[in-house]
């Protein structure tokens, strides 16, 4: 039997992830009028553009919800965000500027916690506002079924009857007005925004055109650093980690990780740190474009990676980064709690993050322009005296280096022989301007 319901299950409990926006408000009221028994579940993810969470369940009840609950997901969201940071679970970047997978992390938390709450209420049918072309429909599907194997999925936006009756925002707004609700449709923006405490995503509409840039976006977690009239003073900030956990900013500790990240957001946001413009591949392999904000995570990650490079050896760092890219893709695909993701994540947390203790001081300027001013850690393996150009006691002598270089003759000879073979069979034919050695067919 299919887990996807294409028509409204009348007379049954239907849970809906309720944001309080026009789409979910109209869908909830429509479901009630059509004979379903809707239950509304709202995730408090610390969205920077939401200032009245307590009113959302009340509105859901007014629109016809049989029950409405507000689920505080902030602690879990920050915990998963720090886990992603510790394991470098970020696979999308452009010219070294990173997208911190803030929406996929939010979906992992929302999908599991809301369905768990529904299960407590005996609600085994779930709907949300994700569209069939996006990533979220698959993410929510996977996380929901992981928590509740008996779950059925009903999405009004996949129901042709709903689409025919309320297919657009104008129709939804008129439907709510005719139902007696003073619902005023908000002004249409040039793009769509989704956010949580970790970061914000701006996409769709005008941003679908690559001719439209970051300058049309109004940041909600930071400042428009590209504007000449925005004054941004440079600022020094010190980040302290203990065993992979961020614990202090500028010497100040916090009662919990949520409060620390909020302060990191404020500091990074003052500079527009962590904003990026990315072209990415959705789960269905179609390319999309997003402009992202993540000021707090960007600040913490800059300090964390500095300590990683000062503490761990080259092979460990290489493994951390390769595994992080793979883990980031799993996270993006809605597989954050799959066994292969847990293995990669916990390996990094144990063998990389646990050694990360120390302080990094940065100077923040505009956007992603910053400098590292100081790095301190009791675990540093960076020892400048080993390679000092001054006359100091050395761990190896010039004669030692002569011997080491002499041993390289073996692989240099092997490389030269291979290049000669490639040249003979026509695989190697560099032009005159090439720096590649002109290996001839005959030995010299």
Curated annotation (Swiss-Prot):
NAD as UniProt keyword: no
Entry-linked PROSITE patterns: ARGININOSUCCIN_SYN_1 (PS00564), ARGININOSUCCIN_SYN_2 (PS00565)
Coiled-coil region: none
UniProt-recorded Gene Ontology molecular function terms: argininosuccinate synthase activity; ATP binding; protein homodimerization activity
One Gene Ontology biological process: argininosuccinate metabolic process
Family named by the database record: Belongs to the argininosuccinate synthase family. Type 2 subfamily.
Protein's name in the database: Argininosuccinate synthase
């Amino acid at each position: 039997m299919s887990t996807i319901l294409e028509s409204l299950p009348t007379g049954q409990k239907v849970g809906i992830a309720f944001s309080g926006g026009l789409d979910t408000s109209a869908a909830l009221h429509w479901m009630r009028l059509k004979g379903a028994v809707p239950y509304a579940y709202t995730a408090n993810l610390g969205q920077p553009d939401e200032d009245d969470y307590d009113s959302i369940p009340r509105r859901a009840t007014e629109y016809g919800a049989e029950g409405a609950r507000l689920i505080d997901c902030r602690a879990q969201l920050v915990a998963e965000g720090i886990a992603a940071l510790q394991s470098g679970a970020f696979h999308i970047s452009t010219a070294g500027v990173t997208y911190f997978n803030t929406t996929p992390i939010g979906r992992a938390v929302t999908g599991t916690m809301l369905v768990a709450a529904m299960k407590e209420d005996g609600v085994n049918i779930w709907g949300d506002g994700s569209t069939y072309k996006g990533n979220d429909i698959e993410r929510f599907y996977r996380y929901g079924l992981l928590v509740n194997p008996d779950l059925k999925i009903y999405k009004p936006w996949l129901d042709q009857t709903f689409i025919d009756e309320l297919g657009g925002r104008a129709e939804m707004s008129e439907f709510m007005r005719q139902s007696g609700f003073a619902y005023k449709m908000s002004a249409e923006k040039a793009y769509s925004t989704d956010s949580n405490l970790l970061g914000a995503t701006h996409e769709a509409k005008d941003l679908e055109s690559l001719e439209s840039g970051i300058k049309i976006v109004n940041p909600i977690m930071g400042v428009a650093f590209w504007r000449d009239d925005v004054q941004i003073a440079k600022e020094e900030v010190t980040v302290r980690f203990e065993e992979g956990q961020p614990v202090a900013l500028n010497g100040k500790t916090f009662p919990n990780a949520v409060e620390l990240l909020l302060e990191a957001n404020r500091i990074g946001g003052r500079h527009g740190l962590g904003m990026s413009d990315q072209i990415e591949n959705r789960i269905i392999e179609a390319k999309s474009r997003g402009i992202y904000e993540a000021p707090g995570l960007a600040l913490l990650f800059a300090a964390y990676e500095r300590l990683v490079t000062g503490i761990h050896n080259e092979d460990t760092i290489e493994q951390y980064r390769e595994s992080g890219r793979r883990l980031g893709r799993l996270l993006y695909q809605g597989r954050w709690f799959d066994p292969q993701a847990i293995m990669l994540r916990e390996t990094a947390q144990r063998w990389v993050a646990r050694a990360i203790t120390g302080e990094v001081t940065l100077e923040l300027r505009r956007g992603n322009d910053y400098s590292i001013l100081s790095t301190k850690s009791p675990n540093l393996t960076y020892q400048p005296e080993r390679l000092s150009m001054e006359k100091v006691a050395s761990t190896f002598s010039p004669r030692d280096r002569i011997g080491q270089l002499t041993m390289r003759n073996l692989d240099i000879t092997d490389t030269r022989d291979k290049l000669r073979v490639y040249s003979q069979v026509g695989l190697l034919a560099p032009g005159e301007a090439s720096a590649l050695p002109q290996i001839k067919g005959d030995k010299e």
